């Protein structure tokens, strides 16, 4: 759809945009800037994907002419904006009208009239304006500076203004938008209605055209306007001139009629085929309306983006999805339209965030809708959906309901809606509107990237349709499993009155035009989405969290990719806490809670895929919502680097992250599952975040990255192969799934960005789903039979979708695993120590035995245990697939053995998981579990000690898989061991922080895992390291991560410090847990281990040597550390075995040169015990 939309958009006003869009230089400059500056902010990550690909490219291409034109034609632009805002208002005001669709069209028409004239006057300029607006939107959401730079590469001066202005504008716009929404609602209701009928026909073509143009340009137009000082004045002027827009509608009507006629022919044909082709007949109809809406939304976004800025981050995250389509430049634009949809999600976030802004605006749904959502709604149903809630008899009531609950709901809703994601975002935003908003959006951005981006075409609609599930359900569900979104729609639809907040967004975005029709479409879209999700398993990180932004708001966006994982972790971790608090908070906000149950029921069906993730957001959001502000900040910090902040921030942050990720993933790729499918782009596996990724996470995400990468891979954050599996186990959904989702994400990340996101999406959804079921019941009283039936159908569809996604995910993972196994087996054949696997098995057994003891203690929360259990089970499955994959790689020495061992471990882990969820985690997934499972570490040390050699070899493999597992388990432990996670995460961060700068506690873990997968490839040596130092390292890692001083243990140090990533992985699973919970115990055991191992380390195995590396070079390297006894080169195996005279030298060499690059080849240095 993105391509189709892009093409048609490009054809119309978009043609100019398209040409400029295609400019290679412009795109590069944008990317460069986006990369530099986007990376600066959390949202920037998303921006990179989205703005970079779509917005920034367009903007940079058009920035010179268009920006100048913008400045020169600020009046026109203002009018355009006015029309946009007018549209926004009209949407709300007109919501009274029967046709939300018309309403949107109307608004769009007005803006379309002006814009059509405007566009005719400045085809490029207008497009540019749109783009500029979109860019500004991002800019404002983002640091504003980076964004502006990114999208206004050529406008340094303007950029400066933008940067300065955006913040003011953000605040100002928010206020203005609120006012605007309030005033125009009344003013425009009449005018818009009048226009509605007149322009209805026109609007289709105009809005379609605008959609194309606005998707690309209008969006940037809005961004630019918002960023530009002119934009600031625009906001004010727009407010004043909104009536003008209506007035203009008379004059512009003629021009618009022509323009619309022309565009309709151009675009209707195009859109028809595009939208129809993409979405199907009904979808096409909806598409037209959606596009209209999108264009209107864009107009609104233009106007509202400033207002949305604080709240806009969610929008931006949604917008980021366009980046996935960026390849299709016009698709980007079309994505922009979908983007609005996704912004829709964010808008919904803005929706809720808007409440924070305009909490005083009980109509906030309306206002937010206008403010935040309206912009998104303009392009898609989001706004319409908002309108629908108002306009629908039912919707109006819901709107009112949200009004009351909005204040309370925002936060509580966060929890419930977190699963939807958008709600969470909104809720997130409510408390900490700016922070929450910007941060959740960040994740959403990436998450969106994760899941929604690929399915963006549908996502927008889903956003529109799923708008109710909104980000969380929508993106999460959407990305994770299209079915979940529909349930939220139903839930929201029926729940609409009750949890209007989420429902409203949902209704507004989704049902706005078709609230009722759309739901039918939903089913269609759902299927489509499922298709999308499968296609973009990662789809987001995004939904990774849409709730995408909400479910995975934290996860994908900020740490987009790590947060995804982190978020799942946080949610996992927080979930236990949040789950308790969440429910209470939720109940207080009665509506939110109903919504939560409501929304969650769909997720529950989704649980296998999305539940883990989604639920955590839902659970977490409320509790965290209140602290979300700080968490959001923390998220920021985490995003940047939470090494230190993680502990304090992590607890809150993590939940937030998770929610973020989850929201993001729903937004971006609400759940890994959706993300994966959506983000299939990013992550194959289960694809939210997005999500650090969504791209894989996971962030499902996830999604949703090391951070970013992860987000995209999964949103970052959302990566959960495991998560998917975890999701499969609804039991573990809340915590396990959350934790699973991140791990899954990591696995998926290893496997593929898609998987990661997909999984992540799944987790969020699953968790949310159970609640949703409750919610369904809770909200059922308020629901009419029709709504309930809708919801039930949607839930069923979600379930089916989840199953399908799960199957796909598993298939993907299995295939990936098979590939990895083949690769690893090949490597293993080349490597020695195939005998080690059996000892590892023993070790595993031993570890498992201790694990129960330790494992039980590890399970701090019953929830955690259950979660871990489910998660472990899922992880075990995943690990079989994903770890098998990793293991083969990891166990280069003993590929088959490693696999066996791994499987054996997994089997044991399964057993243990069932017995002691934590234990298996600590063992099978010690790294992950170890964080929470100190006992795991302890037992682990014992195990490693007993079969030191075997342990080292087998363990390393275990650890290696552990690395993968580590992420997975990490998530688990995160979910299971909420409290421990902080410290563990910290440790992980310290040791693994290097690996994952995200610094997101869990996100970090996941991102690391994602990165680790890549590392897994080059991890033959790492495996070796694991074999010797690795095994020790995991235990030592705790100490090492805690203080690399464990260096004395040498092995530990080497693995912990040198293979920081590896160590982190290990530490995560094993060592970290030790240092965290039993930092000291572990060190002792580590020391023992070291002692046992010390005799062993004289021999160093250097793997992954470049064929051009000579023994002389290698010898000089070795001699630089210490004297060597012998050096044996095995060129056919691309490895060398050297024996040092002193074990300390071997350790030092391993520490110094592990993952060192020689002749463009990264060598893996492992200590070999003789």
UniProtKB/Swiss-Prot annotation:
Coiled coil ranges: 789-835
Residue stretches of biased makeup (Pro residues): 311-329, 419-433, 481-490, 554-568, 582-630
Modified sites of kind N-acetylalanine: 2
Domain RRM: 1098-1170
Region (Disordered): 1-152, 199-221, 259-708, 721-784, 833-863, 942-1050
GO cellular component: cytoplasm; nucleus
Residue ranges with Low complexity bias: 335-348, 357-372, 394-403
Compositionally biased spans, kind Basic residues: 267-278, 632-642
Asymmetric dimethylarginine: modified positions: 470, 1028
Biased composition (Acidic residues): 37-49, 112-126, 203-214
Keyword Endoplasmic reticulum applies: no
Record-listed Phosphoserine modification sites: 41, 205, 233, 741, 765, 951, 973, 991
Result, substituting residue 1101 to A: Abolished interaction with ALKBH5
Keywords tagged on the record: Acetylation, Coiled coil, Cytoplasm, Isopeptide bond, Methylation, mRNA transport, Nucleus, Phosphoprotein, RNA-binding, Transport, Ubl conjugation
Biased composition (Polar residues): 82-108, 662-708, 721-732
Stored Gene3D superfamilies: 3.30.70.330
GO molecular function list: lncRNA binding; N6-methyladenosine-containing RNA reader activity; protein-macromolecule adaptor activity; RNA binding
Subunit text: Associates with the NXF1-NXT1 RNA export complex. Interacts with ALKBH5; facilitating ALKBH5 recruitment to m6A-containing transcripts. Interacts with SENP1; promoting ALKBH5 deSUMOylation and subsequent activation.
Stored PANTHER family: RNA-BINDING PROTEIN 33
Reported function: RNA reader protein, which recognizes and binds specific RNAs, thereby regulating RNA metabolic processes, such as mRNA export, mRNA stability and/or translation. Binds a subset of intronless RNAs containing GC-rich elements, such as NORAD, and promotes their nuclear export by recruiting target RNAs to components of the NXF1-NXT1 RNA export machinery. Specifically recognizes and binds N6-methyladenosine (m6A)-containing mRNAs, promoting their demethylation by ALKBH5.
Name under which the protein is recorded: RNA-binding protein 33
Upper lineage: Eukaryota, Metazoa, Chordata, Craniata, Vertebrata
């Amino acid at each position: 759809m993105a391509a189709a939309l892009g093409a048609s958009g490009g054809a119309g006003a978009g043609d100019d945009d398209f040409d400029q869009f295609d400019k290679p230089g412009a795109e590069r400059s944008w990317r460069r800037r986006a990369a530099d500056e986007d990376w600066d902010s959390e949202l920037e990550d998303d921006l990179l994907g989205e703005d970079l690909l779509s917005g920034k490219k367009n903007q940079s291409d058009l920035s010179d002419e268009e920006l100048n034109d913008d400045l020169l034609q600020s009046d026109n632009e203002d009018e355009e904006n006015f029309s946009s805002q007018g549209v926004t208002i009209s949407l709300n005001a007109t919501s009274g009208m029967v046709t939300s669709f018309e309403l949107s069209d109307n608004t769009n028409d007005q803006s379309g009239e002006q814009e059509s004239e405007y566009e005719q006057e400045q085809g490029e300029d207008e497009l540019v304006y749109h783009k500029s607006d979109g860019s500004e939107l991002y800019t404002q959401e983002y640091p504003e500076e980076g964004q502006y730079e990114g999208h206004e590469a050529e406008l340094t001066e303007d950029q400066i203004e933008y940067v300065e202005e955006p913040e003011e504008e953000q605040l100002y716009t928010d206020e203005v938008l609120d006012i605007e929404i309030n005033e125009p609602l009344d003013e425009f209701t009449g005018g818009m209605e009048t226009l509605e009928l007149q322009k209805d026909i026109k609007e289709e073509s105009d809005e379609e055209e605008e959609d194309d143009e606005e998707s690309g340009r209008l969006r940037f137009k809005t961004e630019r306007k918002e960023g530009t000082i002119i934009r600031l004045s625009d906001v004010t002027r727009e407010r004043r001139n909104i009536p003008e827009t209506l007035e203009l509608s008379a004059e512009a009507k003629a021009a618009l009629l022509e323009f619309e006629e022309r565009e309709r022919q151009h675009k209707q044909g195009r859109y028809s085929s595009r939208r129809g082709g993409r979405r199907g007949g009904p979808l096409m109809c909806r598409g037209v309306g959606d596009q209209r809406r999108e264009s209107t939304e864009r107009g609104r976004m233009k106007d509202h983006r400033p207002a949305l800025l604080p709240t806009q981050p969610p929008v931006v995250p949604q917008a980021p999805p366009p980046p996935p389509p960026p390849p299709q430049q016009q698709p980007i634009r079309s994505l922009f339209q979908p983007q609005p949809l996704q912004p829709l999600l964010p808008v919904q976030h803005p929706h809720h965030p808007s409440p924070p802004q305009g909490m005083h605006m009980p109509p906030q749904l309306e206002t937010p809708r206008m403010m935040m959502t309206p912009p998104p709604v303009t392009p898609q149903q989001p706004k319409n959906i908002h309108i629908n809630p108002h306009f629908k008899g039912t919707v109006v009531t819901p709107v009112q309901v949200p009004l009351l609950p909005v204040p309370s709901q925002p936060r509580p809703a966060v929890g419930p809606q977190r699963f939807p994601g958008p709600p969470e975002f909104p809720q997130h935003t409510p408390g900490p509107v700016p922070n929450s908003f910007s941060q959740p959006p960040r994740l959403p951005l990436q998450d969106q990237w994760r899941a929604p981006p690929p399915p963006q075409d549908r996502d927008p609609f889903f956003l529109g349709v799923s708008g109710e599930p909104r980000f969380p359900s929508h993106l999460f569900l959407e990305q994770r499993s299209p079915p979940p979104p529909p349930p939220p729609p139903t839930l929201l639809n029926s729940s609409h009155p009750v949890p209007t907040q989420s429902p409203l967004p949902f209704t507004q975005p989704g049902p706005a035009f078709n609230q009722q029709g759309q739901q039918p479409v939903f089913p269609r879209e759902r299927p489509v989405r499922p298709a999308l999700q499968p296609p973009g398993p990662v789809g987001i990180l995004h939904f990774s969290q849409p709730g995408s932004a909400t479910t995975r708001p934290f996860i994908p966006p900020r740490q987009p990719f790590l947060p995804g994982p982190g978020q799942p972790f946080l949610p996992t971790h927080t979930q236990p806490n949040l789950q308790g608090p969440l429910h209470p908070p939720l109940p207080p906000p009665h509506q939110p809670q109903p919504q939560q149950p409501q929304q969650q029921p769909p997720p529950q069906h989704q649980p296998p895929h999305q539940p883990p993730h989604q639920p955590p957001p839902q659970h977490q959001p409320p509790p965290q919502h209140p602290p979300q502000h700080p968490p959001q900040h923390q998220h920021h910090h985490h995003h940047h680097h939470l090494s230190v902040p993680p502990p304090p921030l992590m607890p809150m942050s993590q939940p937030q992250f998770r929610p973020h990720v989850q929201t993001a993933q729903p937004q971006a790729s609400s759940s890994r599952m959706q993300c994966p499918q959506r983000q299939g782009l990013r992550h194959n596996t289960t694809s939210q975040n997005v999500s650090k990724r969504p791209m894989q996470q996971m962030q499902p995400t996830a999604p949703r990255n090391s951070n970013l990468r992860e987000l995209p891979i999964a949103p970052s954050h959302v990566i959960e192969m495991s998560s998917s599996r975890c999701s499969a186990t609804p039991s573990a959904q809340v915590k396990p799934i959350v934790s699973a989702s991140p791990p899954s994400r990591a696995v998926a990340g290893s496997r593929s960005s898609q998987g990661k996101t997909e999984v992540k999406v799944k987790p969020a959804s699953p968790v949310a789903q159970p609640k949703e079921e409750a919610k369904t019941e809770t909200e059922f009283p308020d629901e009419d039979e029709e709504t309930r039936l809708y919801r039930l159908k949607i839930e069923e569809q979600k379930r089916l979708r989840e199953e399908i996604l799960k199957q796909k995910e598993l298939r993907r993972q299995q295939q990936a695993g098979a590939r990895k196994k083949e690769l690893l087996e090949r490597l293993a054949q080349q490597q020695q120590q195939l005998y080690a696997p059996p000892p590892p098995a023993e070790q595993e057994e031993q570890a498992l035995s201790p694990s129960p003891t330790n494992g039980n203690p590890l399970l701090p929360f019953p929830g955690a245990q259950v979660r871990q259990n489910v998660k472990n089970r899922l992880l075990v499955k995943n690990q079989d697939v994903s770890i098998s994959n990793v293991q083969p790689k990891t166990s280069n020495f003993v590929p088959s053995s490693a696999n066996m061992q791994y499987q054996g471990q997994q089997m044991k882990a399964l057993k243990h998981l069932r017995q002691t969820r934590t234990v298996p985690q600590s063992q099978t997934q010690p790294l992950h579990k170890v964080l929470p499972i100190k006992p795991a570490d302890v037992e682990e040390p014992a195990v490693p000690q007993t079969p030191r050699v075997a342990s080292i070899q087998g363990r390393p493999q275990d650890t290696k898989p552990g690395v993968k597992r580590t992420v997975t388990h990490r998530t688990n432990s995160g979910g299971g061991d909420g409290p421990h996670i902080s410290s563990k995460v910290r440790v992980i961060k310290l040791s693994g922080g290097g690996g994952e700068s995200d610094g997101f506690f869990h996100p970090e873990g996941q991102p690391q895992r994602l990165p680790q997968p890549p590392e897994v490839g080059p991890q033959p040596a790492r495996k070796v390291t694991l074999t010797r130092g690795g095994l020790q390292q995991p235990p030592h890692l705790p100490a090492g991560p805690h203080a690399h001083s464990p260096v004395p243990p040498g092995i530990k140090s080497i693995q912990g410090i040198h293979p920081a990533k590896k160590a982190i992985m290990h530490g995560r699973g094993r060592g970290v847990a030790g240092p965290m919970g039993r930092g000291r115990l572990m060190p002792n055991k580590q020391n023992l281990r070291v002692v046992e191992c010390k005799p062993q380390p004289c021999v160093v195995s250097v793997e992954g040597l470049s064929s051009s590396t000579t023994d002389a070079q290698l010898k000089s390297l070795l001699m630089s550390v210490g004297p060597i006894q012998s050096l044996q080169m095995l060129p056919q195996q691309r490895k060398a075995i050297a024996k040092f005279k002193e074990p300390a030298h071997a350790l030092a060499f391993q520490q110094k040169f592990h993952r060192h690059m020689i002749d463009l080849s990264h060598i893996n240095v492992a200590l070999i015990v003789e």
